[in-house]
């Protein structure tokens, strides 16, 4: 099986609304962003970069050896930030980029490789991403857990923070990881954000505005939690202390 040619970019902001300065929060002796970077290095990516608009983050990430690209402060989303990186690095239009969220320190390398291959195997699809089954009913009520619906072909139908009406159907949690080609990034970033995207704080809704298909697979491994809140941080600290 031929290996997919892909690059990982980790967008990292300091001014997170839900957990201020979380990229630099200490988790068992290392910053959150260093743990995410280490997770990415375990994948088959040919290169891993960090994209930030913060000098403090840049200093920390360069000190642990990460190639770090300084970007504008005005970007509306991590995808928009990564598009600037693609322009600065002059990547080819068909280069596959994996956007690994800067709050995902427990993302398995297998999932990073999986989402890149999913896009590579879907030449007519704009974006690829992953999901896991929601087994804890509390997650249905948690707005930090993004719910995704997709059809039998694996194409996304909707993304929501709230479940509008509960039923016995299987609910899926959207994971903070995307793969797209540089050409898709450009189209995405040139399009204005809709009121719905802004209100929901879900950048992937812009793809629907552009009629881009988003293909989804169940993640090969269930990752640990993303760090959105103080409670998440404490859970991740405990998990990493035991590993």
Where do the protein language model's features map onto the residues?
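N-terminal glycine-rich phosphate-binding loop and ensuing alpha1 helix
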Residues: 3-52
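Short, acidic/turn-prone active-site loops that include or flank metal/cofactor-
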Residues: 14, 72-78, 221-223
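Short, structured coil segments at secondary-structure junctions
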Residues: 44, 64-65, 210
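Short, high-confidence coil segments that cap the C-terminus of an alpha-helix
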Residues: 45, 92-94, 122-125, 212
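Short phosphate-binding loop-to-helix
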Residues: 49, 55-117
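Conserved core of the sugar-phosphate nucleotidyltransferase
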Residues: 107-196
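Conserved alpha/beta core of the MobA/IspD/sugar-nucleotide pyrophosphorylase nucleotidyltransferase superfamily
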Residues: 171-243
């Amino acid at each position: 099986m031929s290996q997919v040619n892909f690059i990982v970019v980790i967008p990292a902001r300091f001014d997170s609304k839900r957990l201020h300065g979380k990229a630099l929060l200490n988790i068992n002796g290392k910053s959150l962003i260093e743990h995410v970077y280490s997770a990415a290095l375990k994948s088959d990516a040919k290169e891993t970069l960090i994209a930030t608009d913060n000098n403090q983050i840049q200093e920390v990430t360069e000190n642990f050896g990460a190639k770090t690209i300084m970007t504008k402060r005005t970007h509306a989303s991590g995808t928009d930030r990564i598009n600037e990186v693609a322009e600065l690095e002059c990547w080819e239009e068909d280069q596959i980029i994996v956007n690994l969220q800067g709050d995902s320190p427990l993302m398995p390398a297998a999932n990073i490789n999986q989402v890149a291959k999913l896009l590579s195997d879907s030449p007519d699809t704009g974006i690829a991403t992953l999901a896991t089954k929601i087994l804890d009913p509390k997650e249905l009520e948690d707005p930090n857990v993004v719910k995704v619906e997709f059809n039998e072909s694996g194409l996304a139908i909707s993304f929501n923070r709230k479940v509008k009406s509960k039923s016995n159907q299987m609910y899926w949690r959207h994971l903070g990881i995307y793969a797209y080609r540089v050409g898709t990034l450009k189209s995405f970033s040139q399009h204005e954000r809709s009121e719905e995207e802004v209100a929901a704080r879900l950048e992937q809704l812009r793809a629907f505005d552009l009629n881009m298909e988003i293909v989804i697979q169940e993640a090969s491994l269930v990752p640990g939690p993303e760090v959105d809140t103080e409670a998440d941080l404490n859970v991740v600290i405990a998990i990493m202390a035991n590993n």
